[in-house]
Amino acid sequence: MDIKKYEVLLAVVDKGSFIKAASELGYTQSGITYMMNSLEKECGFPLLQRSNKGVILTLEGERLLPEIRQLVQLNKRLEQDFSEVKGQIAGKVRIGCFPTIVCAVMPRIMRIFRDKYPQIQLDLVEENSVGVLEEWLESGFIDVAFFSRQPRYEYDWFPVKEDRYVVVMSKESPLTAYDVIKPNQLEGQPFFMYRGSDGIDADVASYFKKNKADLMPTFTSSSDYAVLYMIEENLGIGMIPELLTLHSEEKFPTITTRPLDPPAQREIGLAVNHYDTAVPAVQRFVQTVQKSVSNGTLII
């Protein structure tokens, strides 16, 4: 039994594509195809099929998927336990992050973690959809999700930071006359909003719904920076996490921000599916982030 083939199978299923799986794992597409053909030959029946949604599992593949995921996870843990017995901490942690977190936070976290655990590889996967990150965490495609907490979470949660939202605007905007912005002041304004693959920012949408503000985005983009470029030209205003603006002031010198009243904020943290049984490398990553934040080594 070649565990590597099962790891490749999971990547193909999670990505829905041979090409994307090859890119993720560092293989050629032909190499991925060969391994999957070989695995299906060993099994004696097809595991994958093509559909209008990409590559998906056959009924036989779906039946075996839970056991395959468990097998791969147990193998990963066994390899890391071997390393610990030998006095080494090694392995790989795959982290799913919002793009804003990748830009604003992860470089410093990676530096701190690499200095402490040089044998543990960190693999970052960017995704702007809360729903997709949740699915990846549940399926085991990622080990840790680094995003904002939602009421429906069923995972072990480790808070890192309270991150407030601010209204961002050109310095030429009339709204700069106000020290704080009320939600109803944004109604009727050309409004630019960040949009994930499953819709507009869930935290922003929840805030406006709670405060009964009627907001219709004029422009949406899957790139925070695209939104900022539009606002820089005084084409409208937006609402983005303050975490992003702290690292954008030099790049966008003609924009400014204002807080909201009532405040809008989100809790940023790490989500792990069953922390107590997670592999040692995952536990070390969570512990390092929490300790670095609490002792001031990592200031976010």
Protein language model features and the residues they cover:
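Secondary-structure junction motif
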Residues: 190-211, 278-286, 296-300
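A short LG(V/I)-centered, amphipathic sequence patch enriched
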Residues: 40-57
